[in-house]
Amino acid sequence: MTLHAQQISLSIGKKQILKDVTFAARAGALSAIVGPNGSGKSTLLKALVAELPSEGQISLNGRLLQDYAAWELASLRGVLPQAAHLAFPFTVLEVVRLGLMAGPEAQNTRLPFEALARVDLEGYAGRSYQELSGGEQQRVQLARVLAQVGAPMREGQPCWLFLDEPVSSLDIAHQLTVMDIARQFADGGGGVVAVMHDLNLTAMYADHVHVMTGGETAGAGTVADVLTDQRLSEVYGCDLRIGKVPADAAVFVLPQTARA
């Protein structure tokens, strides 16, 4: 089963943000979208989940998005937004329960607590969401998404996580916790699409990388094929070098000097 988007274009006002982008991700894999600020990463993710209207075709698990009922999509995919702010005075538990409202597990009282435990927030259920730090709010939102989709597979179909910069507000320990959760979800047969800024975390966890620049695709493929010195240096406008850890040949990205 796959996610497939073909010739996606999107404009806001008179400004074109995405230009004929084709994107593919498969269930059982973690696909990362990377690129510099303003390259169209988050806009592409929003187009993939139909949060923003776009030209082109998008299919999920073999069906066009428009052929799904809203409740079907809610049970198959969870979306973690970049901004975690909520204007209402919810408790943490109430926020996580929002993820259950549209699905078959709406009355499941156990799932929200299990989801909070997975993101290291046991004991936070009764706390005010607005009083949490940005990183804690980000983890609460991930718990909401996990409660919504449940397991990586449902009735023989893969479920999907769409994560917009899921570790941007987190310390290194919780970055690894969140990426481990995403990796485990993919290893369990689900699909994960994540907008990432950290190229080293991308190299550690991703199976597939899609590089964006100027609203267009600059490369797509495996970590080894896509994360190259030349491509990254051109896309990011600075001198980047790819190295490998001797013990296991894992790829890492090492910045050199900024371009003059």
Curated annotation (Swiss-Prot):
The keyword Transferase does not apply. Residues 3-239 form the ABC transporter domain. It is found in: Cell inner membrane. GO terms for cellular component: plasma membrane. ATP binds at residues 35-42. It holds the Pfam family ABC_tran. It is a peripheral membrane protein. GO terms for molecular function: ATP binding; ATP hydrolysis activity. Its EC number is 7.6.2.-. Keywords: ATP-binding, Cell inner membrane, Cell membrane, Membrane, Nucleotide-binding, Translocase, Transport. SMART domains: AAA (SM00382). It comes from the Bacteria. The keyword Nucleotide-binding applies. Its main location: membrane. PANTHER family: HEMIN IMPORT ATP-BINDING PROTEIN HMUV (PTHR42794:SF1). The complex is composed of two ATP-binding proteins (HmuV), two transmembrane proteins (HmuU) and a solute-binding protein (HmuT). This is Hemin import ATP-binding protein HmuV.
